[in-house]
Amino acid sequence: DKDRPGYDYTAFFARSGLMADLAPAGGVPLIPVGGIGDHSVAVALAGGIAASLFKRERTGEGEKVDVSLLQSATFIGCTGVLNGFNGRKLPRDRYDCGHAGSNTYQGSDGEWFYLAVIDYRRFPEFCQVIGLPEIASDPRFNTVDAYYKNKAELTHIFDKKFAEHPVSYWHELLEEHDLPHEILRHFKDVPDDPQVQANHYMYPYEYKDGTKTVFSNGPVHFSSIDPAEIPCKISGPIGRDTAQVLEELGYTQAEIAAMYENKEIR
């Protein structure tokens, strides 16, 4: 299939199972945003290049580094691939997740958060904190086996409880007791996230016409470089360096001018 046309939507998301099996059962397939597959490949390729340069430094031998969208997707989604290979029915809905302590829940404000009380030993404490102490001793949930077996029923109970207050209320309560969770943020919220700002994960940028935007920083920080001091520069308009590159390749200015006139380049 090396000659087939494709994008990260097709080769990364559709071909790998991510698009079909990450979305809830009974609904439409996952609708990804562009570039996730491309960025995943870029990170993998950077690591491969670094490793091959290290090998060349040590042995004098080079490497041809190859990374594909499908290969990166099967690596990222390997847990799902193994689940499917071993007979796990996918996609699944919220009531068929691993257990009720690791699931998404909706507050009264319509927003969602992810509950990650994965350790069953904290289940009684969690029930006490959210105001359902009787659940911890309920025969349907008071053993590990029963807890997993009756996960759908318990999820419905939690659904009703968490619908009593907005997500911010539950966030503060769970945070106070150091119970793992996270609010489901929206993309629009990310640039204002205090953690993102403190670590310079994104850069604000203003174009010459006054338009403001943000750019994502790379996912790796080096101790010798202060991310706050890294300048954010844009690449410029398409074709900005075309003439320079052609000159470096040996074309004359007259030949380049003819290419522009014939609309062979821009």
Where are these regions (language model features)?
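Active-site-adjacent "lid/gating" segments in soluble enzymes
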Residues: 1-117, 125
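Residue-level signal for nonpolar/aromatic packing positions in well-ordered secondary structure
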Residues: 49, 60, 126, 174, ...
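Beta-strand segments within the central parallel beta-sheet cores of soluble alpha/beta enzyme folds
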Residues: 62-70, 173, 257-261
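Aromatic-enriched alpha-helical interface/lid elements that frame and gate functional surfaces
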Residues: 101-177, 181
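Short acidic-hydrophobic surface loop/beta-edge motif
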Residues: 103-108, 202-208
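Short linear loop/turn motifs
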Residues: 137-149, 185-192, 255-266
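Conserved PLP cofactor-binding pocket of PLP-dependent enzymes
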Residues: 175-199
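Flexible, small-/acidic-enriched active-site or ligand-binding loops
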Residues: 207-258
